[in-house]
């Protein structure tokens, strides 16, 4: 099985590759279109701003490929957020693959932002098989509200989507590569059981 991490020039590429390699999945980091087209599974990581991520994808001529791929793709953190229509972060249009808008967390007394740390995630979807009541590691200031495409939810000052899915596109707001055993199980589920 060919597993490719789409090279978005963001900071967490190496840690995701290390996690995949440690699990025995030989992953490649690439932005080469021919190589990406040969993938069985794709990962779209992201750290930073939606504007920066979209600029990089445009610069690397990856937007059309991502929008048209039929291969299972997992967006991670910002990679999930840019699967939507629009991010309120610097008012940025995104990939328009799943119908949602990324919004800033609502301020609430007793909560600090960015949301950083371990939170329980609730889901009965196959992506979360064996992960009932599992905790995952989050680092984000913007979130996706609950909606039609939510497959897992979480709460921190408000309820939000911990994971979304439409067709072959999946997204997780947390960092599975930094979420210990729970993250490893989720990555294995995506590679072995999805698509």
From Swiss-Prot:
It catalyses: 5-[(5-phospho-1-deoxy-D-ribulos-1-ylimino)methylamino]-1-(5-phospho-beta-D-ribosyl)imidazole-4-carboxamide + L-glutamine = D-erythro-1-(imidazol-4-yl)glycerol 3-phosphate + 5-amino-1-(5-phospho-beta-D-ribosyl)imidazole-4-carboxamide + L-glutamate + H(+); L-glutamine + H2O = L-glutamate + NH4(+). Keywords: Amino-acid biosynthesis, Cytoplasm, Glutamine amidotransferase, Histidine biosynthesis, Hydrolase, Lyase. One of its GO terms (biological process) is L-histidine biosynthetic process. GO terms for cellular component: cytoplasm. Its EC number is 4.3.2.10, 3.5.1.2. It is found in: Cytoplasm. PROSITE patterns: GATASE_TYPE_1. The active site is at 77 (nucleophile), 175, 177. The keyword Amino-acid biosynthesis applies. InterPro entries: Class_I_gatase-like, GATASE, Imidazole-glycPsynth_HisH. GO terms for molecular function: glutaminase activity; imidazoleglycerol-phosphate synthase activity; lyase activity. Pathway: Amino-acid biosynthesis; L-histidine biosynthesis; L-histidine from 5-phospho-alpha-D-ribose 1-diphosphate: step 5/9. It holds the Pfam family GATase. It comes from the Bacteria. Gene3D superfamilies: 3.40.50.880. The keyword Hydrolase applies. NCBIfam families: IMP_synth_hisH (TIGR01855). IGPS catalyzes the conversion of PRFAR and glutamine to IGP, AICAR and glutamate. The HisH subunit provides the glutamine amidotransferase activity that produces the ammonia necessary to HisF for the synthesis of IGP and AICAR. Heterodimer of HisH and HisF. This is Imidazole glycerol phosphate synthase subunit HisH 2.
């Amino acid at each position: 099985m060919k597993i490719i991490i789409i090279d978005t020039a963001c900071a967490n590429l190496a840690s995701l590759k290390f996690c995949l390699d440690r699990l025995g999945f030989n992953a490649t980091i690439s932005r080469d279109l021919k190589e990406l087209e040969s993938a069985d599974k794709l990962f779209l990581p992201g750290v930073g701003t939606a504007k920066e991520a979209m600029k990089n994808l445009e610069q690397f001529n990856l937007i059309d490929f991502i929008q048209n791929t039929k291969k299972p793709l997992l967006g991670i953190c910002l990679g999930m957020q840019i699967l939507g229509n629009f991010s309120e972060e610097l008012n940025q249009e995104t990939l328009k693959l799943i119908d949602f808008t990324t919004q800033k967390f609502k301020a609430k007394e007793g909560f600090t932002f960015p949301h950083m740390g371990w939170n329980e995630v609730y889901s009965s979807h196959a992506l979360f098989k064996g992960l009932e009541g599992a905790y995952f590691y989050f680092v984000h200031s913007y979130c996706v509200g609950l909606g039609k495409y939510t497959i897992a939810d979480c709460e921190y000052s408000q309820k939000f989507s911990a994971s979304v899915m439409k067709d072959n596109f999946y997204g997780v707001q947390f960092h599975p590569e930094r979420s210990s055993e729970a993250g490893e199980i989720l990555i294995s589920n995506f590679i072995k059981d999805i698509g």
